[in-house]
């Protein structure tokens, strides 16, 4: 199941894909694809050329919008992490007795970190102690160069109220 994004609704697919911060690895895919939102031809050409060089045989790569103007080193590091994740899945599959869950998509808070946290992020506020631990572990394993202050908001006001984020929801659900 793929979550709805922007104008795209939820989709169900049998294609395996492993999303990274900048790249999506498709272990049984083919080719190098670039996000349509990257619209400068020079950047598309740069990413396509890099993708051809670094793509493992028999796989497909999709460069996400976030890969625009990102250094080759960070893109390669992202791909290496995805390849390692795929190898771990394959190893677990070899030793597991079906039925068994061998991989799970990241929870919502980790998707937010993956997609929105960058080198300019200095603070993340979370209202769940367990989610803070998962977030710290995620950053240690995936974004080791980021230094972020995690603030636990669980004992304070509701996080959406504190940052005045409820108004758009209230007007949407209470028309008139």
Please give the residue ranges for each predicted region:
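DE-rich acidic low-complexity regions and acidic surface loops
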Residues: 1-176
């Amino acid at each position: 199941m793929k979550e709805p994004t922007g104008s795209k609704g939820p989709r169900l697919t049998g294609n395996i894909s492993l999303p990274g911060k900048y790249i999506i690895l498709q272990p049984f895919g083919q080719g190098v694809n670039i996000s349509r939102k990257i619209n400068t031809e020079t950047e598309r050409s740069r990413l396509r050329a890099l993708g051809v060089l670094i793509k493992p045989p028999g796989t497909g790569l999709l460069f996400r919008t976030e890969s625009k103007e990102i250094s080759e080193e960070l893109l390669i590091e992202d791909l290496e992490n995805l390849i390692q994740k795929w190898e771990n899945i394959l190893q677990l599959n070899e030793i597991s007795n079906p039925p068994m869950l061998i991989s799970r998509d990241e929870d919502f808070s980790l998707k937010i970190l993956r997609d929105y946290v960058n080198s300019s992020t200095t603070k993340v506020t979370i209202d769940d102690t367990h989610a803070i631990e998962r977030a710290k572990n995620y950053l240690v394993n995936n974004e080791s160069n980021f230094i972020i202050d995690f603030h636990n908001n669980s004992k304070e006001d509701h996080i959406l109220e504190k940052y005045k984020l409820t108004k758009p929801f209230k007007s949407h659900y209470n028309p008139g």
